[in-house]
Amino acid sequence: MITNTPLQFSVLWASILSWINISSPLILFGLYYGFLTTLPIGPSQILSIRAFLLEGNLSGTVAVSGLILGQLIIFLSIYYSPLYTLLLKPHTVTLLVLPYLLFYWYRIKDLLDYQSLRPINSIKDSRIYKIFFDSFIFQLLNPVLLPSPILVRLINLFFFRYSNNFLFVLSCFFGWLSGHLFFFNCIKFLLIRIEKDSPILYLLVKRIIYRTFSIFVLACILLYLGRAPVPFFTKKLNDELQFNKSGFLWLNKPWPTFFFDYYRWNRPFRYIENNRFTNKSPVKKSVSQYFFNISLSDGKQKISFTALPSLSIFEKDLKTYLNISTNNNNLYKNWLDTKNERKDNLLYELENRIQALDNGLVIKEVIEKKTSLSNNEGINLTKINDPFLNGSFRGKAIITKSPWLLKENSYKLKKNRKIVYLKENKLKIWISNRWRELRRKNLPLPWEPLNKNARRSLVLLIQGSKNKKLKRKLQQIHFSEEQALINLTKQTNISDLTEKLENKHLLNKKFTKISHFNWELVLNLSPRQRAVYFKELEYEKWQILVRSWKNLLSVNSINSTQLNKFILLLKKLFTFHKKFALQEISKELPRWTSKLRNDKFDVIAIGITDIRQRKVKNLGYLIKGKEKRRKIVRRFSQQSDFRRRLVKGSMRSRRRKTLIWKILQLKTHSPFFLRINEKHIPFQISLNKLNLIDVKHIFKNPVEKQKKIALFPTKNNVTLKKKTKADRLAIANRWDFPLAQWGRSWLLLIQSYFRKYLILPILIISKNIIRLLLFQTPEWSEDWNDWNKEMYIKCTYDGIEVSEKALPEQWLRDGLQIKIIYPFILKPWHNLQLETNIKKNLNDLMNTNDNFSTNIKKKKIKYSYLTAWGFETNAPFGDIKKKPSFWKPIRKELKKKWKKNILLNFNKIYSKFSLVKKKITNNSNNSINNESKDLVKENIKINNNLKFNLTNKNYNKKLPEQISSKFSQTILSENQIKNKYKISTNIQKLENLKFLKKSKIEKITKKINFDKIEFFNKLNNDNKVYFTNKQKKIENKQKLIKYYKKNISLVNKWSYFFKLNFNKINKNFFQFSINIIRFNINLISKIQQNLILIKNRKIWNPLKVSQINQKKDKINYKYSNDFGEKIQSLKINVNQENILLMSQAYLFHKIWQIEKTNNKCDFKYLLKNWTSNSVIKKKINRNLKKMDLKFLKEQNWKNWLQNFNKYNLSSQVWYKLAPQKWRNQINYQWKGKEQNNLKFSEKQIKALTLSKEKTFFYKLFIDSLLEQNRKISKRYKYNYLCYSYLDFKKQPNFLESTKNKKESLFNNEILQISKNQVNNNYKQDISLKSNLILWLIPTLTEKKYINKIETINRNNISLLKEKNKKNSRNKKTLRERERHETIRQWKWKSKNIEKRFKELGDMASLMTFMQDQENSVSLSAKMRENLDLFRLLFCRDVGVNKLTINSEHRLPRVLDDQILMYKVISLFLKSKNRFKKNVNITNFNLSTSRIEFFQNNNQNNNFNLINLEDIMLLKHRKELKVLNLLNLKQNTNQILNFNKVILKENKRKRIELNKIQNKNQNLTIKHFLWPTFRLEDLACVNRFWFNTSNGSRFTMLRIRMYT
């Protein structure tokens, strides 16, 4: 027993690791992803939590069981696709989940009874079924609360990938189940904690939980409504398709699509433009998604520019999380190890197959089989349709049963083509037919005749009309028709009545054809008459229908013909309107075009643009300037732009910078500033109140005026601040939302009508009635005139005038302003305006500007803006305008009158009491005198004060106050004075002084105003001069700065220019050095070629060399005058062109090529000087058989590849390289020389041929033909690469495109010569080559003899041995081929019987050819032992069926392979002589019998090396070839040493190997090259990697083709 906990954990961990190793990784993946699906919570989980908290454990477990059952059905729905599409489509969320959620919320919204809060204790309770059903349905519908349900859909992806593995599905389910069980255990723990910790009764807590869950369900419903689009109402674009309204097309669509707008854009959020400055540029249809990342290729890290962004980011995060560090060396080593391992496996497999062949197995069993595609029923697909079939024939060529039977199937082909043509051109034919109908029926031509009924109605119409021209035409038509009838009746002499009737019918037909009543007359009618005419035609059709209907009803027995006529009439009636209407051809176009309308702004409720721009509330025009240009004034909506630059109709994107977290949120807010909005602003004194404190004035006298500071001033100190423009805009923006605009605009209209027609008339009427009551004259006319002047102009929300009567567009939504022109002001009277006019003049003088003129002032139009509460403002949302008070002038007048009346009454009373006061004694006189003196002094003070106050600004106010105060003092003093006379005199003096001072004050004010004006004018002039001087200085400085900038830019440009020139000089110098290198390289290469030629010459004997030189000198001397100049010119031109057109890549390639050629043997010279020597061939054949094939092993294939040339030119090309004249002159020379020459020996003939070959070789190849040869060989390599990669058996005929106009000295290979010819007693056997066989070794032919042009390819060993002596054996007909033995289609049940039967067959065939009796006796004795086998074949009990198995289903029949047939027959079709029956078979591998081995034991002439690559599949062959060619070893020293050894041995034996001419050279060389026989595969693969379509980038790969 383990008591230590760490040991327990270690044991548990070890058991887990062992389980992981044993179990498959899919189980772990399933558990992991199943557990991940528990993270997104849906309504089913919420419902189960609610059941646990409110109704106890039993209800919770029931809810969990329903949830598990629903999830299990979802997992299993993957195996049934209709159920999967039903459950997991997004349409189900909107169509099923939302209504069910609403129904569930309505059910749990209110707590109707406390019984629902009691826990469930028994299964019989009805609530259990509801809980189970709800949880099951919610889990089945699978809605998720998260905005992106990736975790839920992630597991679906793995389900589709591993749905065939049921363990993965089970592990996912158990992972999901374990996660949910853990989740619900946590909920139970939460339930226990709530019950224990709740301070109140748990029933009351349940009420709160009940209410919270109902709110939470409602929040879920709102979330789903926000995520899912409304299915029925979506905004469409302007280019939307117009569907046919008559047909209910949407009913024919499948069930989810007719609920949703499937034409809407899902995720094109933005409209991308090519040009950022213009809006007319086309849209980028496809945006490239280049994402750079490191990728592995050939074991090395390289940059890939088309990586998946999500995958690369995930890989990067995973590496950082797991601390994985990748090393380049380790990666390369791992790659090498894997490749080496794969190579070893393939080689081991090949070795095993070869060993099986050695053990005696049949090739059929050893060859690697290829799997073919088949159905569940076991039926294999045909080879053409098989996707596993490789080659160019898959799905490209239609292969018939036999290409000779094409004429027999021509009729069927034509029929099928017609059917296909009709199907493809269905729309085209329909359009043409419709157009014919329109052209002939629906749109009648003017010269076409009218029907009989149409003619009759037209005649009646013309007769009733007043048109004289038409009546004349009618008379002419009638006259011509009568004459035509008379002529026709004269010609006919008919006796019978039937014949007369028939003749009348014919006459009517002819008459309609020749009738002059055509549609031209209808066109000449007036439009009104034409309309009447067409109506009459319709009416006539109805009449015909009514007549036929009456006839049907009147007749008792209704005939079928009458019914048919009636149906035809109905059809004509209903198709009458359609005939004259053009039938539109409708085609469903792609809805979302790339050209969308993208304006700068979008007017609300118009929807002109296709992309949502900033909303414009309204547009207006302003005319400004002397030119009176119109300016567009637009007001943008101040609402938040939640849909900025989105395509209309597209799905809304999830935006990360603009959140919506409130129930009603008018504006967008960034989450970055949320915390700032939450902070509370501390108490601060408003700036408006601080502005009231005169800070400057306080700081002047701080000690004295501290007491006067008031933070909260009184009413007298407050000065109201006017609203600025910003304040008005803020108020306007505050009111700028639809509901407020709607209420405000209606209030404004009501206020305007209420003011104009209710308030103002009531005021006018009441004022004039009161005037009548006060016995004053009423002012009806003046008031009503002012009332009529007042106008109400409707304006936009910005204040742009629209009109007096009409309202602006969208005024309820955009808003409204009402402008009052000449607003009405109620005045108490209209005559007393003296004081007001004086005040206005004074104010005008004070507020004058520079453009002031003393006598002229323009009158401004008085206006104001009406508010929603009936007030007036100077501007929209401005300050309330103060109206002149109605009672103020009345108060003033009353005060004046009251003062005057009191003074007069006081004087009267005072005069009455004056008589009583006469008794006053003389004592009072002194006091009166003193007081009079005081009065005089006071008068003087008044004068001084007046003079002082003239300079003060407030002289208009202070002066009357001082006068009134002094006047009141005098009155008080006069009351004490008893002398009446003196008081009256003083009063008169004071009044006179007052009037004088007033007149002086007016004069002084005028002077002061004029002085001010002059002072302002002087100041403005001085300022203008000062500012003009400043502007000039600034302009001069700006010019200097521009000049400095230009100089700096010029300096920069010159420096850049010098750099460019310097770079060009460097480039030219570098090119010059490269040219020098090129020249040296050419020299070295030519010297090397000459040296090699000199070395090779040493092989020959000195006698032969001397003879060759003599012949060469003779030929050169003879033809140097004729052709020397031409050859030199050719040399110069070729060299110059090659030097000039050499590229840098080509130069480096040549250098690399020269370096490589130094370390390898070159067989070109021997190939060029090829001669057939029978003696050498025999020796080489013998040596090859005895020699060990150590140099032909698998390890040395690369070196053999470099030493064999894959290329040979055809004779057609050589034939046309040289001109024809040169060939004729040489033939002529050879004829003359051959007549004089004696008979030479065989050695001398050989020497002569060698010398001739060399001379022509020098003449042609060294100069121009060598370059042509290189170019053609290069083209061959690139073209052969393409053709051989697709089909290596196919021989491409691409050299026909490179034909020159020149002629050559070389013969054509396709010359068919049937006889052996002997010239100069020299006998030779001629063997021909065909173009159909792959040519490998180049052979040059020459003009050896004078009389005839022949091919020289001498073979002393004949391919067909003794049979070649007969001409009949060189040819074979097609009929003879059919007599060959067919492939056996029966398989022996036992291998022993099969071997014994083979031996019997071979012995029987040998007996026919054996001549020696001894051998035949021994063979017959052996045959007797096995003769009992033949009896088994003829026994009834045994027979053939019991000894053999029918293997037709495995082995194909003779020529049943269609692709093989096509390849074989296509060769005959391509050849010129494909219709000939005779076929030359000397160059083909014939099926020889086993008897030849026994016949020719001494002569081993059929020695062919075996090709091993056919054992393996082509795919594995290619893989093994590539792996063998790649240098997978890091130490290259061993390889270099091995190469040197091979090169030495090859140099020693190269002459012997090159002179081999076996029966079939293709097989030997193919054996040497079989691993690299298709090296082009590598090039094609690399071509795909580098994304090139030609061979221009092969130099970078450094893949050298075998030369």
Curated annotation (Swiss-Prot):
* Mode of membrane association: Multi-pass membrane protein
Q: Which Cys residues form disulphide pairs?
A: none
Protein known as: Protein TIC 214
Q: Where in the cell is it found?
A: Plastid, Chloroplast inner membrane
Q: Where are the transmembrane segments?
A: 11-31, 58-78, 86-106, 131-151, 167-187, 213-233
Q: Name one GO biological process term.
A: protein transport
Which positions make up the signal peptide?
Answer: none
One Pfam family here: Ycf1
Family of this protein: Belongs to the TIC214 family.
Please provide, in alphabetical order, the Gene Ontology terms of the cellular component aspect for this entry: chloroplast inner membrane
Keyword set includes Membrane: yes
Quaternary structure, per UniProt, is: Part of the Tic complex.
Report the protein's function: Involved in protein precursor import into chloroplasts. May be part of an intermediate translocation complex acting as a protein-conducting channel at the inner envelope.
Record keyword NAD present: no
InterPro entries, alphabetized: TIC214
**Alphabetized UniProt keyword annotations:** Chloroplast, Membrane, Plastid, Plastid inner membrane, Protein transport, Transmembrane, Transmembrane helix, Transport
Q: Which domain of life is it from?
A: Eukaryota
